[in-house]
């Protein structure tokens, strides 16, 4: 029994610590959301999947600039405090966040373009 518990504990992901990530927040089509920062592209949600916890609590992201590329869908610049799974590059929880001016992302030369 203790072997089973040890193996299941080893297979369980270790929860990450909250971290602030800033970059391009993309919503190209309904239900699809990514945040691209200097380190990676982080998946927040994909069409047909359950939204990541905290997603519904985010404020309107189009208040500080939003580039529409597909109807009301598009991208903007945002800072989010999140927990992540570094292996899968998925956001596991959104703690807080909000839009920031587009110029912040545009000025960051180490940030890939959306």
Language-model features, listed with the residues they occupy:
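Bacterial N-terminal signal peptides
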Residues: 1-8
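Beta-strand-rich cores of mature extracytoplasmic or soluble domains
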Residues: 55-114
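N-terminal secretory signal peptides
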Residues: 12-69
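Weak global preference for isoleucine
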Residues: 4, 14, 94-95
């Amino acid at each position: 029994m203790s072997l089973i518990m040890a193996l299941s504990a080893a297979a369980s992901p270790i929860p990450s610590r909250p971290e602030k990530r800033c970059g391009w927040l993309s919503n190209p089509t309904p239900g699809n959301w990514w945040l691209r920062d200097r380190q990676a592209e982080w998946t927040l949600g994909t069409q047909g999947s359950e939204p990541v916890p905290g997603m519904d609590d985010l404020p309107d992201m189009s208040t500080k600039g939003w580039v529409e590329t597909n109807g009301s869908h598009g991208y903007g610049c945002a800072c989010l405090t999140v927990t992540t799974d570094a292996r899968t590059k998925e956001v596991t929880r959104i703690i807080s966040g909000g839009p920031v001016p587009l110029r912040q992302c545009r000025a960051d030369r180490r940030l890939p373009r959306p």
